[in-house]
Amino acid sequence: MAKIINVIGREIMDSRGNPTVEAEVHLEGGFIGMAAAPSGASTGSREALELRDGDKSRYLGKGVLTAVANVNGPIRAALIGKDATAQAELDQIMIDLDGTENKDKLGANAILAVSLAAAKAAAAFKGMPLYAHIAELNGTPGQYAMPVPMMNILNGGEHADNNVDIQEFMVQPVGAKNFREALRMGAEIFHTLKKVLHGKGLSTSVGDEGGFAPNLSSNADALAVIKEAVELAGYKLGTDVTLALDCAASEFYKDGKYDLSGEGKVFDSNGFSDFLKSLTEQYPIVSIEDGLDESDWDGWAYQTKIMGDKIQLVGDDLFVTNTKILTRGIENGIANSILIKFNQIGSLTETLAAIRMAKAAGYTAVISHRSGETEDATIADLAVGTAAGQIKTGSLCRSDRVAKYNQLLRIEEQLGEKAPYRGLKEIKGQA
């Protein structure tokens, strides 16, 4: 038995200079797992609660000492003596201890950090890599895939201080033979984009996720400069590289309208879906995330009707990694993919349940970071261990993003042909 003998919580810093929760789980025999909770900027209203202290005299109210005290107090007391390999049982103990729908008593940041640390400790106890342990927890032992990266090379919206409304413009190196080659392609495009922007006299400062954040006159202009960079880097857009958007539309949804203030345009629900469809006809955009507000379910039905057969429509704020909400989406034919952020739901077990449910319904699952990250690279192991096939973890810049890519390189080196890189076949509507 992988007996838990200690649980330790502490306050550490995330990539935006805000505190977050880190946890350690110690087992008999000297096995230790350590993990940190990420934090989002554009968040869905139904996400599990990230517990902050609210004490304006510390970290402008963003401290997490209460959540840390919950780790070191009630969570520790409840888990001492338990078996770390029994992940579902551990997570249920913490969920029951919290007793709320959205984990607002103990904090999803406290529960998640411990949940992931326990998984890492259990993997160490079993003498196997984390991705292999996750595959076993998922009921899919030995089934792996290297994910196609969605590389966020140009930022707008809540992730940048500029006049671009769409939050993320991403490249996907679908023509690569393996993950290592995909990473190289993305890096070359990233550096070429910097030259293109510099040549136009535009800013090459970066946003929260490492993408550039220049002032451009329209969202179409953002796509045009990316196209230029891809081609200048020696790649063919639509064959070697495809494009993906994260609209984060809830951020510019006001009074039932979609207000693209950067462009000076206002759309109704169907009009904004038509606008996005027109972009997919001009550029090889194969994936659109949060193309409408999380509450605009009628609009989502229309968007899925006009684009769902050819374009991957990803629900992030829409589904918030929640199986109850995903069930409603599946039953109503809303979207065809789910973004997986484990801090939206607050435990590894619930995260795996959402991935399994999505796959069973023919939806894809895209594993994702948050804009506030740490050096913790658990999502790399999660992507491979569930064979999710796609990952969003930012640009080729900032060590909090690159840490995940580097972990994926290590995993691919270990697994070789046991973890295929399937490129475009992983993306809904493109197989």
Swiss-Prot record:
Chief location: cytoplasm
Positions that bind Mg(2+): D246, E289, D316
Catalytic activity, as annotated: (2R)-2-phosphoglycerate = phosphoenolpyruvate + H2O
GO CC terms, sorted: cell surface; extracellular region; phosphopyruvate hydratase complex
PROSITE patterns according to UniProt: ENOLASE (PS00164)
Matching CDD domains: enolase
Cofactor(s) this protein cannot do without: Mg(2+)
Cell location: Cytoplasm; Secreted; Cell surface
Keyword entries, A-Z: Cytoplasm, Glycolysis, Lyase, Magnesium, Metal-binding, Secreted
Record-annotated active site: E209, K341
Signal sequence, start to end: none
Pfam annotation, one family: Enolase_C
Alphabetical GO biological process terms: glycolytic process
Similarity-based family: Belongs to the enolase family.
Function recorded in the entry: Catalyzes the reversible conversion of 2-phosphoglycerate (2-PG) into phosphoenolpyruvate (PEP). It is essential for the degradation of carbohydrates via glycolysis.
Name of the protein: Enolase
Organism: Shewanella sp. (strain MR-4)
Top-level taxonomy: Bacteria, Pseudomonadati, Pseudomonadota, Gammaproteobacteria, Alteromonadales
